[in-house]
Amino acid sequence: MRASGILMPVFSLPGPYGIGTLGDEAFAFVDFLAAAKQTYWQILPIGPTGYGDSPYQSFSAFAGNPYFIDFRLLAADGLLTEAELPAPQPVGPVDYGALYRQRPVVLHKAADRLLASPTPAYEAFCEAQSGWLEDYALFMAVKAERGQAGLADWPDDLRTREPAALAAAKERLAAEVDYYKAVQFFFYTQWNALKAYANSHGIQLVGDIPILSLIHISEPTRRVVI
């Protein structure tokens, strides 16, 4: 059976916070596709972007991009106050430098609220995604601690996953590890809600893979000694 759809990267959706998100505008695009008798919404890779901000170069094959988390949905869940929401911005080209500087400030506030009283949904998410989440969160925490240095520039004991070095890093960076886990919970909560809405309206999401994921990602640290 023939079917058609539209390619629309999440970051290209209009939105008030400098980039397209998984919020109202994404749901409205699903409505548009359904009204236009389309079947597919094709997107680009949705992982956390690395150097150059290309969706095809990600820090993880499994994690979601924190830039796509919708602040308004976090506020609706009681994780942000209205006063903590950034001022709306004019729709225009994405300023990734501004996102890099400003988004973590807001996400930390939401994460702190969640982690102060973890929900059963959060705990279930962490358990279900334990195969990649813990390693990813530790990788990102160490990377932040080391000024975003690439894996090749890490100390040998961390790069080769020496148990003592990993244990020390987990203890030293426990708060940041929890932050990165919470952010992934935010992303996947919103992503799953959007996907369910799209599917219920006869729209299938077609993704892509980050083909430029090389040394600066979390997964090689799990099994490969470089």
Q: What is each stretch, according to the model?
A:
Residues 4-8, 41-42, 205-207:
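Hydrophobic faces of well-ordered beta-strands that scaffold small-molecule active sites
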Residues 10-22, 171-185:
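The substrate-binding groove and active-site-proximal loops of carbohydrate-active enzymes
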Residues 25-46:
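Catalytic domains of carbohydrate-active enzymes, especially glycoside hydrolases
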Residues 33, 43, 139, 198, ...:
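Conserved, mostly hydrophobic/aromatic
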Residues 46-77:
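Aromatic-lined substrate-binding rim segments of carbohydrate-active enzymes
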Residues 67, 76-180:
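Extended, charge-enriched "interface" segments that sit outside catalytic cores
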Residues 180-212:
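Conserved, well-ordered alpha-helix/loop/beta-strand core segments that scaffold catalytic motifs
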Residues 215-226:
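Single conserved hydrophobic/aromatic residue that forms the stacking wall/gate
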